[in-house]
Amino acid sequence: MGSHPTPGLQRTTSAGYRLPPTRPPASVSPAARGGPMASRGLAGGCQAPQALKAQRVAQGAACDGVQQDQLWRELLEAERRGQQRWIQNWSFLKDYDPMGNKKEPEKLPDHVPLFSDTVPSSTNQVVGSRLDTPLGQTLIRMDFFFTEGARKKKLEDQMQPI
C-alpha cells in the first residue's frame, strides 16, 4: 500500500468527501491548468472564441456584446495597419515578374458594351436562349412525346358527367 496515492483514484476523507488532487493529472494540458502558457485573454478580459465553454460560463457577463464589438474593431484595425505596412514595404513587387523584369500594364479596351450578343443577360434567357437551336427543338419534341401519358386528356363523351 504505502503513502503514495494510486493513479486514477481520487483521495477521500474518512467521512467520504472527495479532496482535490494534489497535482493535476498528466493528461491535463498546461494551458488548462493555468501554467505559463495559459491562454491570454483578449480585449476586456474576454476569452477567444475557441476558449472552453466552462471558462465562458465562469466569466459570466464579462464577455458581453460590447466587448466582442470592441475586440472585432481592434482586429479590423490591426488588419488595416497590416495592409498599410504591406503597401509601404512590399507593394513595389506587384510591378515586377518573378525574374525581376518590369511588367507591362494591360491595355484596357476603350469601350465595353453593356450587353453581350453571345451570353444571355438574365437567368430566364439562359434557359430560353438555347431552345431555338436544332438540338433544342429536338429535345422539345422528345419531351412532348415522352410525357404524353402524363398529360391530362379530355374524357370521351360517354365518360363526361351529366
From Swiss-Prot:
The name this protein goes by in its record: Ciliary microtubule inner protein 5
Superkingdom in the source lineage: Eukaryota
Entry keyword annotation includes Cell inner membrane: no
Sequence segments annotated as region (Disordered): 1-44
Subcellular localization: Cell projection, Cilium
Keyword Transmembrane recorded: no
InterPro entries: C20orf85-like
Keywords attached to this entry: Cell projection
One GO cellular component term noted in the UniProt record for this chain: cilium
Gene, per the UniProt record: CIMIP5
